[in-house]
Structures are given as structure tokens and as C-alpha cells.
Amino acid sequence: MNLNPYLDVAPEVAAAVAAGKPVVALESTIISHGMPYPQNVETALKVEQIIRDNGAVPATIAILGGRLKAGLTAEEIEYLGKKGQDVTKASRRDLAVLVSRKADGATTVTTTMMIAHMAGSQVFATGGIGGVHRGAETTMDISADLEELASTPVMVVCAGAKSILDLGLTLEYLETHGVPVLGYGTKELPAFYTRKSGFEVDYRVDTPAELAAAFRASLDLGLRGGMLVTNPIPEEFAMDHEVINRAIDEAVAQANAQGIHGKATTPFLLAKVKELTGGDSLDSNIQLVFNNARLAAQTAAELCRLG
């Protein structure tokens, strides 16, 4: 565990790490920017319960009053949920200023990986990672999540990159930076709301024990960076490929027309897709997060068995 002077590790999380028990990190941007209140709080608490039910300790991560928090109370989750998009969406570039100002921040995949690593958690469950945005060849809009995956040794369990992105370029970027992309029970990259994307992952892996063994080998080899596990949304909650792609294309067109860019892009696109699908995309989003939390907890437990 990193004895960072700005880090507060919840007692339950600290005890689990010290005892070599499984811990699963969770981000907080999904609470503040990913869903409306009260669904955001209900979802966050349910995700924590799923992790407990599968033998691990949840560590929801955020920045509160300038403190890096690894493990939140239910009251702190409620606070973030109610504050919603008034909370700064905090990536790596924001950390120092937020800490110095004693401000609040909701952690992205990037900052969740950083703080999880400081706190001693090796596995992190999220919905989908950021990536290379459509049109990035001219805008250079590439999520910091990809750089963090290349440099921080944390396993990230997700449902693929968010399908609002350019998935092909995202995979190319990860390959360039040496980040292994594994498919859980699939050789095809899942595309967040749907199980298929038309792109292949590097390797198919079929059990949590296999995932844990691969990550343990990565750590033992001293390889820099993390590992991306892509876990397809359960069939019964997957959206129709054509319906979601139409909604995404329309949302991207509206974002371009309104000049939306930078950190505002993803929340805008997710909200617009939700509106265009009559709320179906939010339901799918919630279910895929539950599914990823389950797999992350099972994998974290297997990782602990390996010592």
C-alpha cells in the first residue's frame, strides 16, 4: 500500500488489503455523471453488494474535500449522487489542483486506477473504458484511460470501450502501448451496449481463475501497465445493434453540431443516447455494470488464492 499523505483508505478496505483478501475498486464518475439521481446511488450500492456477495470487499473511489478516498460510506455515495454533474469529473490532470483546493472530484477510469493502485487494490470493475473518439484523427480526442492502462498495473473489468467511440482505433492504440485486451468467454470485442463489434480481442479467457493467472504472470514478469478484460453484456440485456448504432450516430452528429468537446463529450453522448433509446440504454448500462462487478469480485478472489 502506498502511504500517500493525501490518501484515506476505508478501514474495511485497509484490513482486507493487509490480510491479503480480495478488494475490487469502483469508479465514481458513473455516480456523478453516468446516471441520474436516485438511480445512480441505488446502482452504486447494489454494485457494492454484488461484490460482497461474490467474496470481495468493494472500494468505491472518489476525491472528497481534497482527500483521495479508497472506500466510501453510503452517506458519501449519496452526497456524490445528489451533487451529480456539479462534481468535477477528475482525470489525472485534475488531481493536483483538486487536492490543493480541497475540492471534490468524481474519479474516471484513469484516476480510479491510480488511487486503487495506491491503496493496494489490483482489480477494478467499471462499465466501459474511454478511448479514441470518432474523428480523433483531426481532434486528437483520446481518453487518458488508455495511457493509464499502459502505465498502472491494475486489471480493469469492463464491457468493452463505450460504443460511442472509434473501437478500431482504440484497439490499435492499446496494442501500440502493449496493453493486453482479453475477452471473457468471447474472441470478439464487446461494444458496451451490445455483445458484438466486428473487432477481435487478443485472447479469449473462460474462467476467473484463468484471468487471475494471466494477471499474476503479468505482475511477476514486471510488465508495466494493466490488463483490460472485456466482459460482454448478458444476452438478455443487450441492445439491438442497429438501434443503438443509429442512436449513437445521431448523438455524435448533435455533439458536433453543438461544438461539444473534451471531458463534456462522453456525458453528453450517453445522455443523448439514453434520450434517443427511450431509456433502454440506461437499463443496459446498469446491468452490464452488475455483470462486471460479479466477474471482478470472482477474479479478485482467485488472484488472492495465487498469493
How should these model regions be labeled?
Residues 1-20:
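N- or domain-start disorder-to-order transition segments that initiate the globular core
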Residues 15-18, 23-24, 53, 115-118, ...:
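Solvent-exposed alpha-helices and their adjacent loops that cap or buttress functional pockets
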Residues 24-26, 58-63, 105, 123-128, ...:
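General beta-strand structural signal in soluble alpha/beta enzymes
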Residues 28, 33-35, 41-98, 220-236:
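Glycine-rich nucleotide/cofactor/substrate-binding loop typically near the N-terminus or early
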Residues 38-44, 76-81, 131-150, 173:
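A glycine- and small-aliphatic-rich helix-loop capping segment at beta-alpha/alpha-beta transitions
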Residues 106-109, 137-150, 154-175, 209-213:
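Active-site glycine-rich loop that binds ribose-phosphate moieties when present
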Residues 195-220:
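Anionic-ligand binding region
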Residues 223-291:
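A C-terminal functional module that forms or caps the active site or interfaces directly
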